[in-house]
């Protein structure tokens, strides 16, 4: 018996929940039977399982480093730990639910699950994209407006900002929980009826268009547009700083500029990964929403949908490994936590990675330009 794979249909109406439904008849669309291979039933959940395991290892290790290594508890690392927590939430809720539809021909989580799971999943997506926006704002302040940084109670303020991101994300996800329900759907071509967990019934074609466009704007386009503005000013400031730096230079200023470049590059990599991994999922959701009355049973649509979903979940496990490649301090801590390196390594990292406040002023070759570079917790290379 072919599995319940309505993820290849346009009836998949939630970009974060995918298609979790119960066929009243254990049937697959006839067109699909011509090309669907039974091996998909096991291969696809296995890929989901691999993503979950890798993501759990990476994100749990990252959070453990932040909680146990005092020198790593700085402003950007707190945001990144919050990002890792959101990724963990997505991996332990959305990924197993998504994988279950290939192993069972019915919705396994009841009406309560139909309301709770979309809420949790949308909260996680909101935490991810809004935290990336906050990280970009933090890098903007550190590089473009360093004089605005207040060292006192900085970590406490960032904790409040991180908590506010979670609260806003949950508030935005409340409509998903309120309106999601088990709705009946009917496929005319195959004369099949099934029950689908969706945020609206099949009767109104306007609802999916509004829902898909709102999700695309709020959780993708608008945050990425804000991030782009921040990084435009960051890039402009770094270019100007490079031109205005005296020829003889100041070793401390050069190191600080290089450190800020590394931090900005790391956040930009996170943003790029998010944009790349989530764009296909949003595009397919928009396509389905604007072709709601049609049912696409083609192999191309089925495979593209699966790849888009897997790519979206992959985003929840790649950030720790991107950090591993970009940050020497995190790489040392990661090896210590995960690979059980010698105990002395942790102590050395504490002494060499101690937080300090650096202030350096110098005159550029332009007499009217004076730079005062102040930032907390970024003089060392330690950046998770």
Swiss-Prot record:
Stretches assigned to the Cytoplasmic side: 64-77, 138-153, 236-265, 327-384
UniProt keyword list: Cell membrane, Disulfide bond, G-protein coupled receptor, Glycoprotein, Lipoprotein, Membrane, Palmitate, Phosphoprotein, Receptor, Transducer, Transmembrane, Transmembrane helix
A GO molecular-function annotation: bombesin receptor activity
Modified residue annotations for Phosphoserine: 351
Membrane topology according to the record: Multi-pass membrane protein
Phenotype reported upon loss of the gene: Mice are born at the expected Mendelian rate, are viable and fertile. They do not decrease their food intake in response to gastrin-releasing peptide. Mice consume more food per meal, but the overall food intake per day remains unchanged. Still, they display increased body weight relative to wild-type. Contrary to wild-type mice, their body temperature remains nearly constant when exposed to cold (4 degrees Celsius) after intracerebroventricular injection of gastrin-releasing peptide. Mutant mice show increased locomotor activity and increased social interactions.
Its biological purpose: Receptor for gastrin-releasing peptide (GRP). Signals via association with G proteins that activate a phosphatidylinositol-calcium second messenger system, resulting in Akt phosphorylation. Contributes to the regulation of food intake. Contributes to the perception of prurient stimuli and transmission of itch signals in the spinal cord that promote scratching behavior, but does not play a role in the perception of pain. Contributes primarily to nonhistaminergic itch sensation.
Family indicated by similarity: Belongs to the G-protein coupled receptor 1 family.
Protein name as catalogued: Gastrin-releasing peptide receptor
Annotated organism of origin: Mus musculus
């Amino acid at each position: 018996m072919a599995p319940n794979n309505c993820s290849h249909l346009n009836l998949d109406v939630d970009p974060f929940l995918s298609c979790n439904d119960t066929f009243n008849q254990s049937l697959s669309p006839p067109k699909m039977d011509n090309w669907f291979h039974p091996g998909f039933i096991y291969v696809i959940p296995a890929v989901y399982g691999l993503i979950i395991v890798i993501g759990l290892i990476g994100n749990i290790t990252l959070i453990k480093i932040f909680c146990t290594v005092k020198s790593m508890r700085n402003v950007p690392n707190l945001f990144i730990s919050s990002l890792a927590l959101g990724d963990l939430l997505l991996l332990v809720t959305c990924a197993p639910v998504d994988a279950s539809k290939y192993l069972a021909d019915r919705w396994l989580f009841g009406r309560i699950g139909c309301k709770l799971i979309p809420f949790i999943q949308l909260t996680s997506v909101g935490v991810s994209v809004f935290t990336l926006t906050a990280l970009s704002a933090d890098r903007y302040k550190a590089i473009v407006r360093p004089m605005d940084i207040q060292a006192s109670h900085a970590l406490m303020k960032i904790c409040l900002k991180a908590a506010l991101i979670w609260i806003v994300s949950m508030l935005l996800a409340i409509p998903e929980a309120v309106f999601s329900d088990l709705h009946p759907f009917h496929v005319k071509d195959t004369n099949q009826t099934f029950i689908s967990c969706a945020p609206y019934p099949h009767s109104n074609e306007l609802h999916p268009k509004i829902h898909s466009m709102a999700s695309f704007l709020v959780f993708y386009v608008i945050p990425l547009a804000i991030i782009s503005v921040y990084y435009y000013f960051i890039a402009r400031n770094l270019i100007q700083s490079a031109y205005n730096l005296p020829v003889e230079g100041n070793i401390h200023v050069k190191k600080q500029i290089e450190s800020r470049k590394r931090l900005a590059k790391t956040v930009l990599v996170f943003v790029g990964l998010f944009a790349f991994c989530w764009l296909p999922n949003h595009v397919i959701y928009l396509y389905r929403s604007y072709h709601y009355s049609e049912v696409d049973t083609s192999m191309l649509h089925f495979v593209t949908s699966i790849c888009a979903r897997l790519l979206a979940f992959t985003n929840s496990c790649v950030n720790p490994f991107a950090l591993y490649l970009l940050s020497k301090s995190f790489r040392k801590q990661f090896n210590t936590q995960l690979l059980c390196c010698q105990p002395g390594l942790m102590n050395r990292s504490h002494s060499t990675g101690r937080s300090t406040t650096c202030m350096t002023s110098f005159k550029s070759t332009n007499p009217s330009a004076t730079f005062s570079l102040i930032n907390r917790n970024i003089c060392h290379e330690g950046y998770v």
